[in-house]
């Protein structure tokens, strides 16, 4: 699995790229994702995530995490869209997970846990979206929450 991490300059001393790679890798393994998959992770600030949220979700406000798919959304049939061919010898790019560090920090404080715990939760949430899980309907939300809970238990030792 190839996991590329970009931590924007204001947050470089606050976030470990290795930590994020480990969380993403463990989440993908637990979900039996294709080992040749690749994923991008970006840690950014409120302004950039607000711009992305406005542009792609028409919500003019910051958010905690955004996921941008490169695959079809059905977790039982993860394939690249027809207009995005993947050569047989190349990794399948799942997509990008963008996380707002300031929002993660706020949420961690409100929840009474560490920023790393919140970053892990948001990253798991974003990766699950890339794998096709969603929470717009009650049944789908229950399935996604179950996978999030399992992943958080799985990475508990990384957080300690």
UniProtKB/Swiss-Prot annotation:
Its EC number is 3.1.-.-. PROSITE patterns: UPF0054. Zn(2+) binds at residues 125, 129, 135. Its main location: cytoplasm. Binds 1 zinc ion. GO terms for cellular component: cytoplasm. Keywords: Cytoplasm, Endonuclease, Hydrolase, Metal-binding, Nuclease, Ribosome biogenesis, rRNA processing, Zinc. Its cofactor is Zn(2+). GO terms for molecular function: metalloendopeptidase activity; RNA endonuclease activity; zinc ion binding. InterPro entries: MetalPrtase_cat_dom_sf_prd (IPR023091), YbeY (IPR002036), YbeY_CS (IPR020549). It is found in: Cytoplasm. GO terms for biological process: rRNA processing. Pfam families: YbeY. Belongs to the endoribonuclease YbeY family. Single strand-specific metallo-endoribonuclease involved in late-stage 70S ribosome quality control and in maturation of the 3' terminus of the 16S rRNA. This is Endoribonuclease YbeY. It comes from Dehalococcoides mccartyi (strain ATCC BAA-2100 / JCM 16839 / KCTC 5957 / BAV1).
């Amino acid at each position: 699995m190839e996991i590329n991490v970009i931590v924007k300059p204001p947050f470089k001393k606050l976030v470990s790229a290795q930590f994020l790679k480990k969380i993403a890798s463990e989440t993908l393994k637990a979900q039996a994702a294709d080992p040749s998959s690749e994923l991008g992770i970006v840690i950014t600030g409120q302004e950039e995530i607000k711009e992305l949220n406005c542009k792609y979700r028409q919500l003019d406000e910051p958010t905690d995490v955004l996921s941008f798919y490169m695959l079809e959304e059905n977790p039982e049939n993860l394939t690249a869209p027809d207009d995005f061919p993947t050569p047989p010898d190349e990794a399948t790019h799942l997509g990008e997970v963008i996380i707002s560090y300031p929002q993660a920090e706020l949420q961690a404080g409100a929840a009474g846990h560490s920023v790393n715990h919140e970053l892990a939760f948001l990253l798991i949430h974003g990766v699950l979206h890339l794998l096709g899980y969603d929470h717009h309907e009650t049944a789908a939300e229950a399935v996604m929450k179950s996978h999030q809970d399992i992943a958080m238990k799985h990475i508990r030792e990384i957080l300690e």
